[in-house]
Amino acid sequence: MKFVDEAFVRVEAGNGGHGCLSFRREKFIPRGGPDGGDGGDGGSVYFVADKSVNTLVEFRYQRLLRAQNGQPGMGRLRSGKKGEDLIVPVPLGTTVYDKETSELIGDLIEAGDKLCVARGGRHGLGNTHFKSSTNRAPRRTTSGEEGEARELKLELKLLADVGLLGLPNAGKSTFIHAVSKATPKIADYPFTTLYPHLGVVRVEEYRSFVIADIPGLIEGASEGAGLGVQFLKHLERTQLLLHIVDIAPLDGSDPVQSIQAIISELEQFSQNLSQKPRWLVFNKIDLLPPDVAQARCQEIINRLNWKGPVYKISAIKRQGTELLCYDLMSFLETNQRSI
């Protein structure tokens, strides 16, 4: 499914209903007083975080969201009906900005989070309100106020616990497919993953975490090379980064240079992102004899002066992936999510 991480939409709240100009007209009461009712408030537009929604794709086909207007007041002191609020479900992790001012309106993180993005107009008053000792038959009413209207920018950052880093063809898509139910497109050419993928890794019945696979980076991405760094923002809310490294690249490239290229792109994109906990995961160890694979991994560790956690896996054969997933689960449970 194509992933949409940005959308633009116009929201219009309902206008308030006008107040009513009316007088009592009943038999034997020739000069009845004012009985004009108030209008109804206009409906508001709300965004609600819904865990059953996972993209912003619907907003590509529905660019205008409009709540109902309030009904006008009526005689016999009857108020107009309030306009119905418009409740719009959005994915967890949606950030809402005012398109014109870039003002942050709100962030919808947890299921059920509710955000008013356009407030309905207040109702108008009927002529009953303007009766006084000197004016027994007021002909004055007020109009309902216009509802708020604004252009919005919606941005979706994936709410994943673990993010995958790596150059194209490092095996990230194969890894997420091996450990979760995600089914990203997998092939042997750069940029196979053109849109972010989420996978749920379930290590036991009630122990699971979410992992995000984003398009592979290449050196110079921050200058626009390859797919650029536009998808790196999806990793900003993760607690941990897994750096997938191909230790047997078919093009003969140097894994150390590949790792350093990724680190450089991270630092250029965001200092906070570059300082997140990061584990090295050496992939495709099945393509080398065990002693050669061990020696190559150790060489990379030494050249990088790497002090962090290291794992050796074969994603395609699911070798070493179970231990890695259990260790990830333990790390996440020890370090509670804080967004």
Curated annotation (Swiss-Prot):
Binding site for GTP: 166-173, 191-195, 213-216, 283-286, 314-316
Enzyme Commission no: 3.6.5.-
Domain OBG-type G: 160-333
Named cofactor requirement(s): Mg(2+)
InterPro entries linked to this entry: G_OBG, GTP-bd, GTP-bd_Obg/CgtA, GTP1-OBG_CS, GTP1_OBG_dom, GTP1_OBG_dom_sf, OBG_GTPase, P-loop_NTPase
Every Obg domain range: 1-159
Origin: domain of life: Bacteria
Residues bound to Mg(2+): 173, 193
Catalytic class of the enzyme: hydrolase
Compartment(s) of residence: Cytoplasm
Keywords for the protein's UniProt record, in alphabetical order: Cytoplasm, GTP-binding, Hydrolase, Magnesium, Metal-binding, Nucleotide-binding
Region Disordered: start-end pairs: 127-147
Record has Metal-binding as a keyword: yes
Chain ranges passing through the membrane: none
GO BP term, example: ribosome biogenesis
GO cellular component term, pick one: cytoplasm
Assembly behavior: Monomer.
Function noted in UniProt: An essential GTPase which binds GTP, GDP and possibly (p)ppGpp with moderate affinity, with high nucleotide exchange rates and a fairly low GTP hydrolysis rate. Plays a role in control of the cell cycle, stress response, ribosome biogenesis and in those bacteria that undergo differentiation, in morphogenesis control.
UniProt-recorded name of the protein: GTPase Obg
Organism, as annotated: Coxiella burnetii (strain RSA 493 / Nine Mile phase I)
